[in-house]
């Protein structure tokens, strides 16, 4: 088993609906560790950098508009195979198709307003982490 870190972001719809505690609770109950967490509003510049892999896709503008529409809660989650474990916990991108029991399956009916974002690979985590956090914000415990 490989200990990894991954990024998990509660998007503006999740914050607005009061689901921060639910997301944190699921992470903790799974046995993963939160080693950094903060609430913030992403600037357009940060949002464009964060979603840069989607820059050439038709939904890029809408994605940036949505993620900057309200506060988000970003956290760094650590644990065995954290990237794949968290991806399984959040479910399919489209909340209408996400399995019951997943965060999106339980709380989302949309592909954009789908409560959370999570890194899809260790490489994505490294890129996304640098946009939202600095190493000094990691708390080892």
UniProtKB/Swiss-Prot annotation:
Residues forming the catalytic site: 117 (pros-phosphohistidine intermediate)
GO CC terms: cytoplasm
InterPro entries: NDK-like_dom, NDK-like_dom_sf, Nucleoside_diP_kinase, Nucleoside_diP_kinase_AS
A Gene Ontology biological process term: CTP biosynthetic process
Keywords: ATP-binding, Cytoplasm, Kinase, Magnesium, Metal-binding, Nucleotide metabolism, Nucleotide-binding, Phosphoprotein, Transferase
Sites where the protein binds ATP: 11, 59, 87, 93, 104, 114
Gene Ontology terms for molecular function: ATP binding; metal ion binding; nucleoside diphosphate kinase activity
UniProt KW Magnesium keyword: yes
Catalytic activity: a 2'-deoxyribonucleoside 5'-diphosphate + ATP = a 2'-deoxyribonucleoside 5'-triphosphate + ADP; a ribonucleoside 5'-diphosphate + ATP = a ribonucleoside 5'-triphosphate + ADP
Sequence similarity: Belongs to the NDK family.
Name by which UniProt lists this protein: Nucleoside diphosphate kinase
Native species: Aeropyrum pernix (strain ATCC 700893 / DSM 11879 / JCM 9820 / NBRC 100138 / K1)
């Amino acid at each position: 088993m490989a200990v990894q870190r991954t990024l998990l972001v509660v998007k503006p719809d999740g914050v607005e609906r009061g689901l921060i505690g639910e997301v944190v609770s699921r992470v903790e109950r799974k046995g993963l560790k939160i080693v950094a967490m903060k609430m913030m509003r992403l600037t357009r510049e940060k949002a464009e950098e964060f979603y840069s892999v989607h820059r050439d896709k038709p939904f890029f503008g809408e994605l940036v508009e949505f993620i900057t529409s309200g506060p988000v809660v970003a956290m760094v989650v650590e644990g065995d195979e954290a990237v794949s474990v968290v991806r399984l916990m959040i479910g399919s991108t489209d909340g209408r198709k996400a399995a019951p029991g997943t965060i999106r399956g339980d709380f989302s009916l949309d592909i954009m307003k789908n409560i959370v974002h999570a890194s899809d690979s260790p490489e994505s985590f490294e890129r996304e982490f640098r946009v939202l956090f600095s190493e000094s914000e990691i708390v080892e415990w």
